[in-house]
């Protein structure tokens, strides 16, 4: 008998996401004036952890639309770099994360799901297990920023058993 774990997707917030990385958004934050007073510089994130010798990469992701409920079949992590996704064209997207268990695999019993908006960027901390990007409502275009070596060290994948996966509900 299948034993899927059902996750309820919560609105993405900095507090709920803090143990996995950071949410970068204006929200109700105030900044400091820059550019002769024509702009506000609002603090985003300063935790841009990456291994020495890794090269900075900025790529574009165009993500096809998925529907809820969504079945997660794979989680990945980037042990040597944080990874930032910044919306360029986006309504909503799904963020699925899991802490690392004692066996160094994702702890699926404590996985969480969030729904982010087009006004929220996310920074996964280095080594954080997460699902690949999932677009809701429409195609999503994001920039992805991280540091890479260009080999297998950059990404580890964990495939979930088909009958013991995660299903995200609205």
Show where each model-derived region lies:
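His/acidic/aromatic-lined binding-pocket segments of jelly-roll/cupin-type domains
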Residues: 83-86, 121-122, 133
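Short, structured patches in soluble enzyme cores that scaffold and shape functional sites
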Residues: 97-99, 126, 144-148
């Amino acid at each position: 008998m299948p034993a899927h774990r059902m996750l309820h997707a919560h609105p993405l917030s900095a507090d709920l996401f803090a143990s996995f990385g950071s949410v970068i958004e204006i929200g109700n934050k105030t900044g400091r004036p820059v550019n002769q007073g024509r702009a506000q510089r609002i603090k985003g994130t300063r935790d841009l952890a990456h291994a020495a010798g890794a090269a900075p990469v900025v790529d574009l992701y165009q993500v096809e639309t998925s529907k809820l409920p969504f079945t997660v079949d794979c989680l990945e992590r980037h042990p040597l770099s944080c990874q930032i996704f910044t919306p360029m064209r986006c309504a909503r997207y799904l963020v699925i994360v899991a802490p690392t268990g004692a066996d160094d695999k994702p702890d699926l019993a404590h996985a969480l799901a969030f729904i982010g908006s087009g006004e929220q960027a996310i920074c996964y901390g280095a080594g954080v297990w997460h699902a690949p990007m999932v677009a809701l409502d429409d195609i999503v275009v994001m920039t992805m920023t991280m540091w890479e070596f260009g080999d297998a060290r950059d990404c580890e994948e964990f495939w979930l058993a088909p009958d013991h996966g995660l299903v995200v509900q609205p």
